[in-house]
Amino acid sequence: MEEGRPRMGVIVPGNSSPVPALSAGRSTVEGYDPKLHDPFFDGVSQQLADKGFITAAADDLITWARTGSLMWMTFGLACCAVEMMQASMPRYDLERYGFAPRASPRQSDVMIVAGTLTNKMAPALRKVYDQMPEPRYVISMGSCANGGGYYYYSYSVVRGCDRVVPVDIYVPGCPPTAEALVYGVLQLQKKIRRTGTIER
């Protein structure tokens, strides 16, 4: 370090003398609590703040980016698909949340199951779900997709798409409004931010 330049330091609770940034390992700093702050990264952040950089955990950064670029697979099976289409139109505009439709499962992060799932359609649903890359999410939209709905007692209807694929968000209603689907999308984004996706 050059002579005459002030040294940057971090004040650590329980210690009266400043600890020079980047000079000590995290475990050797007295009073270190990882839930409150990290003196090491505080020092790095202070040094990089005026240069236009910011430091964050990689998992937080990845989940933040992932929630802003969710591509959904259109899987409209019945009348709920009309509301799903309406949510994409200019009045509700799901794309402002970074939620854009894709026709290929290999380019999709989210599948919206909208409508009545029949026994004949269940294998096709599972095949499309298996083609989606990890991490993948499923939104079950409407009473029929959630639990059979009107057709619960029919011999040809699957009583909930969660018997075929794992479901992350349930959107109730018959059919649910476009606002309900938008709310479900926002809940999915919160869930992704909260849980993260990097395996430890």
From Swiss-Prot:
Task: Note whether NAD occurs among the keywords.
Answer: yes
Q: State the reactions this protein catalyses.
A: a quinone + NADH + 5 H(+)(in) = a quinol + NAD(+) + 4 H(+)(out)
Look up the EC number in the record and give it.
7.1.1.-
Per UniProt, subcellular location reads as: Cell inner membrane
Query: From its record, what is one biological process in GO terms?
Result: electron transport coupled proton transport
What role is this protein assigned?
A: NDH-1 shuttles electrons from NADH, via FMN and iron-sulfur (Fe-S) centers, to quinones in the respiratory chain. The immediate electron acceptor for the enzyme in this species is believed to be ubiquinone. Couples the redox reaction to proton translocation (for every two electrons transferred, four hydrogen ions are translocated across the cytoplasmic membrane), and thus conserves the redox energy in a proton gradient.
Tell me which family the UniProt entry assigns to this protein.
Belongs to the complex I 20 kDa subunit family.
Q: What is this protein called?
A: NADH-quinone oxidoreductase subunit B
Name the species this protein comes from.
Caulobacter vibrioides (strain NA1000 / CB15N) (Caulobacter crescentus)
What is the organism lineage in this UniProt record?
A: Bacteria, Pseudomonadati, Pseudomonadota, Alphaproteobacteria, Caulobacterales
